[in-house]
């Protein structure tokens, strides 16, 4: 069984047993199918920690891992907010949040693409600054990226759930700590935990570092009420050994990665489970 499955099931069980309901409040989220309020059970401040001896991907259900990586490339490599660009990759997970101009506004990739840092007298964006600093100033305690920009929040189709990364270089190993203000455990968490670990592996490879720790912090950790039944089914399923992630070792530039440079080997998993989307 995988370490991720074990940590995931423990958090799900904790939410079901002791999570606090928000049904007494008006909520922003609505069910995509019928427009009624989408309520949750939630707990606060959970941490998932991995030593990177295995790839953190669920085995109790099938996770669309290529879709997760494509979304990662859209945000971190292309720094795009254009939903059509994602559609052209065959991915439609952001369609419900598409604004009239076809984008998700000033969210996610838009923030990473803003040239607000300076390297050698040239303005660069957060990703390029991070890559430069990790390579040339590894001992710094300032290796962060931030998607939560108060100046732009009102112009975002959806404020970022995963909003911050912090990177550490110790003894030649690259560690990553991720912070999510809010995480939907049925749909969001399996994608986010996997894709940010892929990001860590990509950056470690192009900069020549070994893998260190991977930590995923969650502020509001919740389950939507319509997801509880299927999550109970999922928790009872057999867990399998984690698969291996192959990343093309010939890629030495972060911007050269394509979806064809990733393979998930020996991914054994339970059947797909459907969870309704709340928007």
Curated annotation (Swiss-Prot):
Domain of life (superkingdom): Bacteria
Catalytic activity line of the entry: dUMP + (6R)-5,10-methylene-5,6,7,8-tetrahydrofolate = 7,8-dihydrofolate + dTMP
The enzyme's E.C. designation: 2.1.1.45
Major localization listed first in the record, in broad terms: cytoplasm
Pfam families tied to this protein: Thymidylat_synt
Gene3D superfamilies: Thymidylate synthase/dCMP hydroxymethylase domain
Keyword set, alphabetical order: Cytoplasm, Methyltransferase, Nucleotide biosynthesis, Transferase
Similarity comment: family membership: Belongs to the thymidylate synthase family. Bacterial-type ThyA subfamily.
Subunit structure: Homodimer.
HAMAP family tied to this protein: Thymidy_synth_bact (MF_00008)
Name under which the protein is recorded: Thymidylate synthase
Organism annotation: Bacillus licheniformis (strain ATCC 14580 / DSM 13 / JCM 2505 / CCUG 7422 / NBRC 12200 / NCIMB 9375 / NCTC 10341 / NRRL NRS-1264 / Gibson 46)
